[in-house]
């Protein structure tokens, strides 16, 4: 069975446009009046990725034409040929046996058609009709009112004069001197207007010599049209096509206009190709005033066993100035992204993600528009893997490579390539209280100029669980065996990173096939007490949950083992209960530790957690030789969360070390909802000798239509902001506008220290959305969703 890609809405124009905007997305409207269900539910507080709000018509006034809309009427025009015609009226003159003269609340119904008028002449033989006075007509897909309407019910054609019309599958409406229905699917309006705004309050509209509506293709076509904002014409369009339902169609998408410090002014005029129901493409030619032309493209496909997307950007001759370590001026440049998922058999899939740039400075030069500057990109990864999973197991075989896209560093900063890797995990319940599991991995690590080799890691375990809702004990016994096979010239490398040694250097790698084997034993236990309490007049359940976690791992000297993909993780609350503080298999910490922690929660009557506070610390019975400290205690780690209502929340964490007698880490995040459509975030993050930063972000509604957006991150050590964004948004019944400017210290994101040539860069973008006609593709949303928690 052929599958269909999701629809894309667009504006098709047969002339070069000077509009400001970008790619359009699907928009539909309900045929009835605006109801409370049309409004969007606010994203819950604390949600990291809130979906963009779809175009909303909640601010639109009800169309008076909908007063005669009959929702019980059929929406199937094909029933006309087999359905009888029903005519009702207060007065009927049938002196002519073939022509009936009806007056007084006349109604004519057949299948999806309904005609109302003050008077009507109906020929029972030819089925011709002539309606006059307060004519109202409904059929599948549209409503219209007119002063006079003539037609034939069998042929499904008619002509109406002095027309006002309303589309039912979209909010499109307008007026026309004449409306002509050729059949059940095709209508043409002469000297007509079209808009999705409130009737009589068109913020935008186009006026055309003719507007043709084809319900079969879902396309409307206007000829000799002028686009107007209010009453002011600003663009002549000899030909314009637009969607009248949610079907996809080929045509121009809205252009995008932006500006960045390295690209200059940018103009993009994408063209969408609806090739088939299950695959499509977009061509995206661009002009950068500071760099020259670019051709971009996207191809999407969806088949029963495979789906994917291919994106490419190509610059034939870059005119920009050199930056970083590579000279790319007057060269070809490109970026390729390919993703694919193919079902092979059963639960096995082939998953591919290929990303490649022509040079290390590509993202630095072409990543400044707001669509791609949500985060600094330093490394591109490409992965191809075959993955499978069952009820108790998962496995994968694949390869991963990396490309450096930081123009200020060499490829030495890259991670090891994994060529190839294989993983297998299982977790099998043996009894209701006993389970057996295993995590295994085999990887070949490759990196020019550094020690290379293969590593196998085997990690089986046996765990039991005893407990009730009031207590639990979870003993676990594991065994970790790690083996290496280093390349033949392994003794030429040394140091903490395994780099090539110079003359006279001595390698710490003494064996070509070193191994490490050790047991890992832990016992996790806890109690849970609860009581009823009240706070601020509300009833809650308060819990008290003490927890003890003992971990024993014997010491193994691992100095002769290379470090391929392992890092010491940042210490946090969950590290109190972790068997290893290292992220990879190259290092396994030794331990003879006991963690003591205490948590208390407040749960409301629905079981929703409204407050939680946790405090914990590790006691070391012996020095940590692999990590490298002889502390008796770890830092105190505390967490606090509070959300007594759905309109605000507070999260905080804190670490204080009795060893250094200093604060090691602290964070504070406050989120407050402002009105129905606003949000305010205040944050502070600190990590000793690494980071101290304040942040404020939010969306502030000025009115139902206007709102301000902004975010700023201030670095205390640097004494200035590292990133700031500010903008304004306007949203009405039928038009939405977004304008955002971003100012940031770009080089700091690429790891350069302060004072090493850092400069402030800027990017600006403007989006316009004519609701129901097309949109810009939410380019700005990706940036604001990252910088403003809870943004929609």
Name each region found by the language model.
Residues 2-25:
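Gram-negative bacterial Sec-dependent N-terminal signal peptides
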Residues 4-5, 29, 34, 42, ...:
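Selective for proline/serine-rich intrinsically disordered segments
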Residues 13-17, 106, 135, 458:
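Hydrophobic aliphatic residue packing
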Residues 26-183, 269, 273, 358:
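Post-signal-peptide, soluble extracytosolic/periplasmic N-terminal scaffold domains
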Residues 63, 88, 136, 142-159, ...:
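Outer-membrane beta-barrel proteins and related beta-barrel translocases across Gram-negative bacteria
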């Amino acid at each position: 069975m052929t599958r269909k890609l999701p629809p894309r809405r667009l504006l098709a124009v047969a002339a070069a446009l000077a509009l400001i905007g970008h790619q359009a997305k699907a928009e539909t409207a309900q045929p009835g009046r605006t109801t409370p269900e049309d409004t969007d539910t606010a994203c819950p507080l604390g949600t990291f990725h809130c979906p963009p709000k779809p175009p909303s018509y909640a601010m639109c006034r009800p169309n008076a034409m909908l007063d005669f809309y009959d929702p019980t009427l059929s929406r199937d025009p094909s029933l006309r040929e087999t359905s009888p015609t029903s005519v009702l009226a207060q007065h009927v003159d049938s002196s002519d046996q073939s022509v009936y003269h009806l007056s007084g609340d006349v109604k004519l119904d057949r299948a999806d058609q309904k005609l109302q008028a003050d008077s009507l002449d109906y020929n029972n033989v030819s089925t011709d009709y002539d309606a006059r006075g307060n004519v109202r007509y409904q059929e599948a897909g549209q409503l219209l009112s007119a002063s006079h309407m003539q037609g034939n019910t069998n042929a499904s054609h008619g002509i109406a004069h002095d027309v006002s019309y309303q589309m039912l599958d979209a909010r499109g409406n307008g007026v026309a001197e004449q409306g002509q229905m050729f059949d059940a699917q095709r209508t043409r309006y002469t000297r007509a207007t079209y808009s999705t705004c409130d009737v009589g309050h068109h913020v935008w509209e186009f006026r055309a010599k003719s507007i043709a509506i084809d319900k079969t293709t879902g396309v409307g076509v206007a000829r000799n049209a002028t686009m107007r904002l209010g009453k002011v014409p600003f663009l002549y369009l000899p030909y314009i096509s637009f969607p009248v339902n949610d079907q996809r169609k080929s045509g121009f998408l809205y252009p995008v206009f932006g500006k960045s410090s390295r690209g200059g002014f940018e103009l993009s005029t994408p063209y969408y190709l609806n090739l088939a129901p299950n695959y499509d493409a977009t061509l995206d030619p661009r002009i950068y005033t500071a760099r020259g032309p670019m051709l971009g493209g996207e191809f999407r496909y969806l088949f029963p066993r495979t789906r994917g997307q291919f994106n490419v950007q190509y610059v034939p001759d870059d005119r920009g100035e050199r930056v970083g370590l590579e000279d790319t001026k007057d060269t070809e440049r490109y970026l390729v992204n390919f993703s694919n998922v193919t079902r092979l058999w059963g639960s096995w899939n082939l998953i591919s993600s290929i990303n490649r740039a022509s040079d290390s400075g590509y993202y630095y030069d072409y990543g400044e528009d707001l669509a791609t500057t949500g985060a600094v990109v330093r490394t591109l990864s490409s992965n191809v893997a075959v993955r499978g999973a069952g009820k108790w197991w998962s496995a994968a075989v694949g390869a991963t490579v990396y490309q450096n896209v930081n123009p200020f560093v060499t490829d030495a900063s890259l991670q090891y390539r994994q060529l190839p890797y294989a993983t297998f995990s299982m977790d099998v319940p043996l009894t209701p209280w006993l389970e057996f599991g295993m995590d295994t991995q085999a990887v070949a690590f490759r990196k020019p100029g550094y020690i290379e080799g293969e590593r196998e890691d085997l990690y089986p375990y046996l765990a039991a669980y005893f407990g009730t809702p009031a207590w639990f004990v979870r003993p676990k016994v594991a065994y970790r065996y790690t083996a290496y096979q280093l390349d033949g010239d392994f003794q030429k490398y040394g140091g903490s990173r395994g780099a090539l040694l110079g003359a006279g250097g001595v390698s710490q790698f003494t064996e070509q096939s070193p191994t490490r084997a050790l047991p890992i034993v832990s016992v996790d236990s806890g109690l849970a007490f609860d009581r009823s309490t009240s706070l601020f007049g509300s009833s809650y359940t308060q819990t008290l949950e003490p927890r003890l976690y003992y971990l024993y791992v014997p010491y193994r000297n691992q100095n002769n083992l290379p470090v391929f993909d392992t890092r010491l993780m940042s210490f946090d609350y969950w590290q109190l209960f972790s068997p290893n503080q290292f992220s990879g298999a190259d290092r396994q910490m030794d331990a003879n530790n006991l963690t003591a922690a205490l948590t208390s929660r407040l749960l409301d009557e629905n079981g929703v957690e409204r407050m939680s506070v946790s405090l914990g610390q590790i006691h070391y019975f012996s020095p940590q030789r692999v990590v490298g400290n002889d502390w008796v205690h770890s830092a105190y780690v505390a967490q606090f969360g509070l959300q007594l209502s759905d309109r605000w929340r507070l999260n905080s964490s804190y670490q204080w070390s009795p060893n250094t007698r200093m604060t090691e880490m602290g964070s504070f995040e406050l989120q407050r909802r402002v009105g129905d459509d606003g949000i305010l975030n205040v944050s502070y993050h600190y990590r000793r000798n690494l980071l101290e930063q304040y942040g404020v972000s939010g969306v502030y509604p000025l009115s139902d239509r206007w709102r301000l957006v902004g975010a700023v991150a201030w670095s205390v050590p640097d004494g200035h902001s590292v990133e700031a964004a500010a903008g304004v948004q306007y949203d009405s019944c039928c038009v939405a506008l977004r304008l955002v400017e971003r100012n940031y210290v770009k080089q700091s994101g690429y790891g350069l220290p302060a004072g090493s040539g850092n400069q402030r860069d800027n990017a600006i973008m403007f989006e316009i959305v004519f609701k129901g006609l097309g949109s810009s593709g939410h380019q700005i949303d990706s940036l604001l969703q990252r910088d403003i928690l809870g943004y929609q």
